[in-house]
Amino acid sequence: MKIHEYQGKQLFRTAGVPVLDGHMVTTPDEAAAAYDKLGGKIAVVKAQIHAGGRGKGNVIDNPDQKGVVLVKSAEEAKAAAEGLLGKKLVTIQTGPEGQTVSKVFVEAGCDIARELYLGIVVDRAGSKPVLMVSTEGGVEIETVAEETPELIFKEHFDPAVGLDGFQVRKLCKKLGIEGAAAKSAYKFMTAMCRFFVDFDCEMAEINPLVITGDGEMVALDAKIIFDENAMFRHKDLEELRDLSEEEESELRAKKAGLSYVKLDGNIACLVNGAGLAMSTMDIIKYHGGEPANFLDVGGGANAAQVTEAFRILLSDPNCKGVLVNIFGGIARCTTIAGALITASKEVGFNVPLVVRLEGTEVEEGRKMLAESDVDIINAMDLTDAAKKIVAATA
């Protein structure tokens, strides 16, 4: 689950991670008032969307309007908010369609001596969280990892213990931090690692992390993703969910008990099993197609779920065809075939439909489909299915 920057900073503050004062607003007049509340000096107006790269992003109809604006008066704060609110902001992470800005964060400015990067993720290979820091703050970390990976420094830590002092000292030495700033870095990094564990995060990223002129380490950003599977332990965090920032199709799928992620391609996939679903997307790509989604109906899929799955897939305007790839195990092929027939009657298929069935009761399932009036293209294996759906949507 993602949250906005201003929400992340509220949580940071409660966890002892230093942040600057700021106010979330939804109108230009509120932005001007927020600027005055912050003391009437330098402030920053930031678009609040669930995507990074806002500082280099721009509004679709106004390329000069960036997603992060430095302001020096209430009038400038109001103008910046007017240029963002209700507009679509395009960043490196939103895609060309952009995301609508419905709120902005007006934050106090500060004396910046250095800009750094800090991020924490789970290293699945190492089975531990890993703290990553870099001297290249304010730059997309993906770019740093590709062009200058030697400037990213890592320290794994035990979630039951946290980050040790010697690890902080190692990182400070590599970052060139000493004196008062090193003491601030110890408090900051250890607090961030505790925050990551206590809140069941999948990722916590600050870019930029700054050292002020008086040696204090402060978070100028907050990008946080929580583990959805741990939300039962954090009922209060559910209140931070902004449904307007999430794909409607993904919300529908979640409600129906389906695992669905929307992608940018035009070949929709309906598969049972996460591993098989990923393999299906890979082989579509291998044969020249572009998958439109990840969709795992699970082992216990019923007719209602399959019907809703087709409604979701066919509601995508980019969908030019559907590949159904089922390996019958817990979910028998006859069950899926029956669900397909029911779905065709309720939804109607107006795009090519390629079906590959294998596993338990496969012959009976194929017979059911053959005797029905569902217009399908049969495939005998996954390669055959991928080739046929790519050809049908070309």
UniProtKB/Swiss-Prot annotation:
Note accompanying the cofactor annotation: Binds 1 Mg(2+) ion per subunit.
Catalytic reaction annotation: succinate + ATP + CoA = succinyl-CoA + ADP + phosphate; GTP + succinate + CoA = succinyl-CoA + GDP + phosphate
State the organism of origin.
Answer: Rhodopirellula baltica (strain DSM 10527 / NCIMB 13988 / SH1)
Q: Does the keyword Metal-binding apply?
A: yes
- Gene Ontology cellular-component terms listed: cytosol; succinate-CoA ligase complex
Q: Quick one: which residues bind ATP?
A: 46, 53-55, 107, 110, 115
Cofactor(s), names only, from the UniProt record: Mg(2+)
SUBUNIT field? Heterotetramer of two alpha and two beta subunits.
Q: What is the name listed in the Swiss-Prot or TrEMBL entry for this protein?
A: Succinate--CoA ligase [ADP-forming] subunit beta
Q: Which InterPro entries match?
A: ATP-grasp, ATP-grasp_succ-CoA_synth-type, ATP_grasp_subdomain_1, Succ-CoA_synthase_bsu_CS, SUCC_ACL_C, Succ_CoA_ligase-like_bsu, Succinyl-CoA_synth-like
Q: Which residues bind Mg(2+)?
A: 207, 221
Record-linked PROSITE patterns: ATP_GRASP (PS50975), SUCCINYL_COA_LIG_3 (PS01217)
Q: Which family does it belong to?
A: Belongs to the succinate/malate CoA ligase beta subunit family.
Quote the pathway field: Carbohydrate metabolism; tricarboxylic acid cycle; succinate from succinyl-CoA (ligase route): step 1/1
Q: What class of enzyme is it?
A: ligase
What Pfam family is a match, any one?
ATP-grasp_2
Please report the stretch or stretches of sequence annotated as the ATP-grasp domain: 9-252
Keywords of the record, alphabetical order, are:
ATP-binding, Ligase, Magnesium, Metal-binding, Nucleotide-binding, Tricarboxylic acid cycle
Query: In its keyword annotation, does this UniProt entry include ATP-binding?
Result: yes
